[in-house]
């Protein structure tokens, strides 16, 4: 029997979460393969040690979807973020990653719902996210969840810059 559950990330899952994040990032963004710039970025940003630090800093900022206790998706909230367009403090959905084989099963929707509930519990009235301008699947998903585009920003890596769409949702 398959059991899907959602919960806050555990330190003991840091390695598995690291692999999950790297896998989804590669599947989504390695359009031209894994460049050195790309490899350097994901090696640092998604290392088990970096994941451990995120969990230690604030366990409620990393929500994990599990199938039979194995990570299949993740949502990361950055509470002390600022909207790059409006220049105001607003929490950011930094990541919403689901393994490709679990697309279409409501995992992303549930992770989004869990993240929004966490933000609302802390008294916030809105939520921002940035998404790669060419990631149409994600943009369409976010629009279906009530997010609207408020502008564009650049996402810098080592040698290249990538255009991201900034989206926002205001809670009633």
Q: Where do the model's predicted regions map?
A:
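Acetyl-CoA-dependent GNAT
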Residues: 8-12, 19-31, 39-101, 109-114, ...
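Active-site acidic-Proline motif in GNAT/NAT acetyltransferases
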Residues: 99-101, 105, 133-134
């Amino acid at each position: 029997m398959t059991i899907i559950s959602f919960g806050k990330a555990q330190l003991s899952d840091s390695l598995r979460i690291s692999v999950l994040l790297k896998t989804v990032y590669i599947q989504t963004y390695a359009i031209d393969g894994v460049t050195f710039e790309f490899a350097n970025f994901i090696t640092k940003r998604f290392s088990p040690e970096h994941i451990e630090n995120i969990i230690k800093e604030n366990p409620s900022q990393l929500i994990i979807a599990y199938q039979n206790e194995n990570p299949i998706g993740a949502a990361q909230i950055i509470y002390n973020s600022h909207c790059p367009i409006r220049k105001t403090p607003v929490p950011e959905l930094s990541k919403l990653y689901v393994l490709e084989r679990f697309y279409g099963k409501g995992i992303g929707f549930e992770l989004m719902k869990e993240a929004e509930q966490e933000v609302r519990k802390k008294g916030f009235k809105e939520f921002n996210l940035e998404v790669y301008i060419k990631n149409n699947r994600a943009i369409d998903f976010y629009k279906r969840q009530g997010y609207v585009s408020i502008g564009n920003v650049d996402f810098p890596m080592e040698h290249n810059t990538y255009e991201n769409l900034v989206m926002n949702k205001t809670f009633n």
